[in-house]
Amino acid sequence: MAQEFSARFARHKDELEWLFMELYNNREGLEVLEREMADAYDARSAELKALDKARAADPNWYKRGNMFGMTMYTDLFAGNLKELAKKLPYFKEQKLTYLHLMPLLQMPHPHNDGGYAVEDFDTVDPALGTNKDLENLTRQLRKAGISLCLDFVMNHTASTHRWAMAAKAGDPWFQAYYHLFEDRTIPDRYEQTVPQVFPNTAPGNFTWCEEMHKWVLTTFHDYQWDLNYANPAVFVDMTKSILHLANLGVEVFRIDAVPYIWKQLGTTCRNLPQVHTIVRMLRMVLECVCPAVILKGEVVMAPKELAAYFGTPEKPECHMLYNVSTMVNLWGALASRDTRLLKAQLDALHALPGNCWFVNYLRCHDDIGWGLDEAAEKRFDIDPQKHKEYLYHFYAGDFPGSWAKGELYNYDPATGDARSCGTTASLCGVEQALESGDTIALDYAVRRDLLLHSVMAFLQGFPMLNSGDEIAQLNGWDYKSDPNRADDSRNLHRSAFNWENAKQRTQKGTLPNKLWQGMEELRKMRADECFAPDAWVTTWDTHNPGVLALVRKHGEETLVGLFNFTEYPAGAGLDALGGSYRSADGQPVWLADVELEPYQALLVKNV
């Protein structure tokens, strides 16, 4: 079996060593890295090595139409990892193939940025279980055909991580793991060019550490210390932890905040070339040791910045990225009843190279940040600032005529910037309709919810639900009464899973059943051969800004999706798309003149 590792390592050895030495010029560090790789391979179980072999023979496994994902917090869904494993029948009922558990490694309590402040990259947080519990869970999921994804927070550690504690105690070895400064001279120069992530709740990019009498670079919160990737020991230690988790059965790593990991004075410290060197090296390490494992990048950047994070077909980096831009544009199109920006953004994504793949979603653990393409807005005579303000006020429910119930996050009155929080159902109007007892409003809210999910599932890549979306879970306003959670409005959509409502998922006519059945229809849709990994996907002009058209082609087969983003009947004309088409119920459809119901998603197939 060691021959497999040797053969894989031989393919990457020259490039890996060249990149490492170019970045670090540290032969000793390179030798340590290569020993860690060999040790990790030796420690990998026979079952996981068999998975490596199968995945190497099927590199498109995560691009197939049957991929269907879900993300959740372990504690909110089931309490802990042992209890979550008992929920496997619920996952199998939904035919999930991908489960992303929010950060579950050891973290400080209660303030940990939702788990993104990590105290130990090798150990499950005791509140959620043990490493053995994680390993048992991954084994059960694997038998069920479900790949487990975990976050790997690359940019920073908690200020209570053992490295940080050693640094505070004066250990120079571990002080070199962070960016530390004795006075404000260099930090002030950084502040001139580096944007602030949380200007209101965590202003500035540096925090004073009284124990060391030094300034620490803290891009996010003051308890999250940025790692110094210019130190090869940091890269080696972090890679060792990823390999450790991979050997526990983790199959996908969401590498968090990856554009931020390299720091250089005089720059924004975003998207620097060295970031790509590090991700490329990490990709090669995984391909040598555990090729079943893939990387999902969290890159909250404009579409033009995304392609670089995939690398090239010859020298790939991330296997896939979160499709943040489309998520934002979907919500924007729904509130504005205008799909022009969404279409333009999708056209930009479709122009990316064929190796680019996305995880599509509507809601996740985070807020909706209104990072729309301002140049595109101006092309359509849309004022970017007024548009942004309209959107976040609309989804907070304080704009006249809004159906949504949500909250603002990180509102900055000086810049007029804010983000939006809330569950999919509540933002689509379900919560408001239930409170008012308006059955017509509820019907429209459900239509909106299903419309957005339909578009998401049709896109290039695969869909990922936020836990609770499949049963129309509402906002959890009770977070306001918890002093440990009340100061973060993102907790509005981070509430305990409603198992009582979930019991209604099979009861015809109930609200949970409508969403549950809607998700089942999407899985059936994705079984079509037009969802093959190499299918061609594009938008199509509908001659109506309220209607989006998406076309999928594979071989001789064509599948067309028409999506009405308005509450009115809407016409669409795809006169340039030739051929004859039928709807799912067998009715002929003339694409040159189609009439859609309010918020209808219509799928038609060529005959």
Residues covered by each model-derived region:
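Active-site and adjacent substrate-binding regions of carbohydrate-active enzymes
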Residues: M1-A576, D585-V607
